A protein has these predicted regions:
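Active-site His/acidic residue clusters
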Residues: 313-328, 377
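Non-catalytic accessory regions flanking glycosidase/transglycosidase catalytic cores in CAZymes
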Residues: 41, 46-57, 61-294, 299-308, ...
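Acidic/histidine-rich catalytic cores and adjacent linkers
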Residues: 380
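N-terminal secretory signal peptides
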Residues: 1-40, 65-67
Length: 581
């Protein structure tokens, strides 16, 4: 083991030539190569992802920066970042897809004693409102590539029941766009609407914006008014399709074909509403054979017409991905760091090529742990309504990694403006319902802490931490490039108007307590407002409706407030410290 010193700050351009070298040396993929391969069934492809491995790597800012061969407590040196703006709260968003029980029996269950007059589950609405989720993506996801938004508006008695071909599920359309907008208003969140770029035309996508955002006087705006919504919805954020590079996607497109379609749609949408924030489809993941090449080709077609580019990633603790090693698994958020840097590099490359003054931001609008309910009956609705699909049961180690993902998103929040935990309820979600109530899974807590305590701007940190090695160890070579991973992962935020700060700390050490000393250079915490940790002796422990408190936060002995603070971090833990200034 060694002590690793690394710098943690929000992403601000290239920090290492390593990223550029990786981009240059990736094997090129001719446009359409993936399409010419034999057709791949969506569920078969999803099942096969486990054998590809996640591309785990020590991030460039962890490489070659001050390794020392001494042992000792971890230290974090914290300071303000001059000129830094507050991070966008949308980086802590979530996702609701017409998939499984996410919508029906999740947020919407008319006739239930737990539902209100509109059919919204009041217990779920209360949980989401308490979380203060800033933005929710809807309606998909794979679902959106075969979705006709007109089926889900107007009188409910006239809405058709159709077969969703993405998940082989009966879709009643009893919950649609206007219902979602009403639900967003009830829970206090902002809508992020997805568009059908699979079977859908540019004309239909533009009509959707007109329906939602134009006040009156046109075919589609007046249709909305006849549906009982006199005022426009004013939806600002839109996804231009979903995972259009994927062979599992309805209406899969080649990169330049998609880029041209996105450009055309965006130009027309901005005539209706120039203030729209439009997100183009990036590569579906680092496992794709066209990863980064897809992003470049898409942006070469539509760079100046879009505002953001999407990223998606899911992780799991399996034999193929991590060798079933908790230590390797808990380092996977560093792969998310690398993923962000590589895609940002492509965006900046295209910006330079096109001599554009616009700098794209990133939308990490699908991220989570997902590896158990990934194939077979877990992904096939078998032509039924609201089937149990993708219902992962999350344990302690899953929650710790979700905490790591939160840290990664926050420290990259000057480039990642929007991010969505996929998903919100029942489907790979922190909340699960039955007919009697709602359960908080283990992953609820790190997400809730970030929403509650992380405010203002992300601070610069310089961290010294003892490390442990991550090596391929017989796994696929692309899974883990040899490197050292810090036991302690830290992020800090500062809300000066609110006179508060927060520390979010992951201890990856699965056996030993770790000590962390935090030194504040230009901030003086005066009191500890809260100090909690998520830990336990069993990494595989999980919550159930019968035992809902197996994995819950515990009070942690608070450090003495001041410009030098020492924390005792339990093994296998994610900790929050809320400070008053």
């Amino acid at each position: 083991m060694s002590t690793l010193e690394y710098h943690v700050g929000v992403l601000g351009g290239y920090e290492s030539m390593a990223t550029m070298n990786r981009l240059r040396t990736r094997a090129p993929h001719a446009e359409g190569t993936f399409n010419r391969e034999a057709a791949v069934d969506r569920r078969t492809f999803l099942a096969g992802l486990g054998s590809t491995g996640a591309l785990l790597a020590v991030r460039p800012w962890l490489e070659g920066i001050g390794y020392a061969q001494t042992r000792g407590p971890a230290r974090a040196f914290v300071r303000k970042r001059p000129g830094a703006a507050d991070f966008d709260r949308r980086v802590l968003g979530s996702f609701l897809e017409h998939l499984g029980r996410a919508v029906y029996t999740g947020v919407y269950q008319p006739g239930s004693p737990l539902a209100d007059a509109k059919g919204f589950r009041t217990d779920v609405a209360r949980e989401v409102k308490e979380l203060a989720v800033p933005i929710v993506r809807y309606p998909g996801g794979n679902f959106v590539s075969g979705y006709n938004w007109l089926d889900g508006v107007g009188p409910k008695a006239q809405r058709p029941t159709v077969l969703d071909r993405a998940w082989n599920t009966l879709e009643s359309n009893q919950f649609g766009t206007n219902d979602f907008i009403d639900w967003c208003a009830q829970v206090g969140t902002e809508p992020l609407l997805g568009m059908n770029f699979g079977t859908g035309s540019v004309e239909a996508a533009v009509a959707y914006v007109e329906y939602c955002n134009l006040p009156r006087g046109t075919r589609w705006s007046d249709l909305r008014r006849t549906h009982g919504y006199e005022q426009p919805h004013g939806v600002k954020y839109w996804c231009l399709g979903n995972e259009m590079d994927g062979p599992w996607q309805i209406g899969q497109l080649q990169a330049r074909e998609y880029g041209r379609k996105a450009r055309d749609a965006a130009k027309q949408m901005r005539v209706i509403d120039p203030k729209l924030q439009l997100i183009a489809c990036g590569s579906s993941g680092t496992f794709m054979p066209t990863y980064l090449a897809w992003d470049r080709e898409v942006l070469e077609e539509c760079y100046d017409q879009v505002d953001g580019l999407s990223l998606h990633a899911y992780y799991g603790n399996t034999k193929e991905w991590s060798g079933n090693s908790a230590s390797r698994y808990l380092a996977m958020n560093l792969d998310m760091d690398r993923h962000i840097h590589e895609v940002a590099a492509v965006c900046d490359y295209v910006q330079g090529l096109q001599r554009s003054s616009k700098r794209l931001w990133l939308s990490f609008d699908e991220w989570n742990v997902w590896y158990r309910a990934r194939d077979g009956q877990a992904t096939d609705g078998r032509g039924t309504a609201a089937p149990h699909l993708l219902e992962e049961v999350y344990n302690l180690e899953d929650a710790l990694l979700v905490g790591g993902f939160v840290n990664t998103l926050l420290r990259n929040s000057d480039r990642v403006r929007v991010a969505c935990l996929a998903q919100l309820v029942n489907v790979i979600a922190p909340l699960v319902t039955n007919d009697q109530g709602v359960l908080r899974q283990s992953t609820y807590y790190p997400y809730a802490w970030a929403l509650r305590y992380a405010r203002g701007r992300v601070l610069d940190l310089r961290v010294e931490s003892e490390t442990y090695p991550i090596t391929p160890a017989g796994l696929q070579a692309d899974f883990a490039r040899t490197g050292d991973v810090p036991f302690v992962d830290v992020v800090a935020t500062l809300d000066e108007p609110g006179h508060q700060a927060a520390l979010l700390v992951l201890n990856r050490d699965t056996t030993d307590e770790r000590e962390l000393t935090v030194e504040w250079s230009d901030i003086a915490p005066k009191r500890v407002l809260a100090c909690q940790t998520l830990t336990g002796s069993d990494l595989k422990a999980f919550n159930t409706f019968d035992a809902p408190r197996r994995v819950v936060p515990q009070a942690l002995t608070a450090p003495a407030a001041g410009d030098r603070m020492t924390l005792k971090l339990p093994p296998r833990s994610y900790t929050v410290v809320h400070l008053g200034l």
